[in-house]
Amino acid sequence: IAPIFWSKGLSWNTTDEAALKDAEAMVETLAKHIKTFNSYPVQDVASGSVILAQCWNGNARQAIDSSKNENLVFVYPEPKSELWLDSYHIPAGAKSLKAAHSWINYVLDPAVAAKETTYTGFLSPVAGIEAHLDPKVAADPLIFPPADAIKRGERTERNETYDRRVAILTKFKAAAAQ
């Protein structure tokens, strides 16, 4: 639902009641034009079963690389886009703390992170990764977004409207392709 807010010049973390009501109404209109919500759209994009997809940059790269369609392109949205990151967490009470720390230390090694980035197509925040990357991979804007794309990124805030925004998105997903 973030693009609804961004198209109106608002943050997707808005607390404006009128904007939230407007988004709720808008999802009813938009839902009939949405084929699916798919967290891993690589096959749908690569096969051509969808003509437009919103997906993570690494998934877009995988779809483009595996498709026979030479016209597939990825763009970083404007005026805003979601700034996303994955993180590792060790659950409280975990019995294998040593193994968990070993795994995290392993994947934070620049050489290992470079292999993971090359394979998945997702950017790694590990310092020193560049020295371990093929220059073609290091220059790929699908992996390493341009500075202006990162600057346009907006993080999700867990503010007082977070649950409401999640509910609007859930309603949107439920109404899609009906």
Predicted regions and their residues:
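Ligand-binding pocket segment of bilobal, Venus flytrap-like solute-binding proteins
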Residues: 2-77
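Mature extracytoplasmic/periplasmic domains
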Residues: 91-150
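Short beta-strand->loop
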Residues: 70-82, 91-94
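A bilobed periplasmic-binding-protein/Venus flytrap-type ligand-binding module shared by bacterial periplasmic
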Residues: 5-9, 84-96, 115
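Conserved C-terminal helix/tail region of periplasmic/extracytoplasmic solute-binding proteins
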Residues: 43, 146-178
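Non-transmembrane alpha-helical segments in soluble domains
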Residues: 2-5, 24, 42, 46, ...
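Solvent-exposed loop/turn segments at secondary-structure junctions
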Residues: 1, 58-61, 79-82, 95, ...
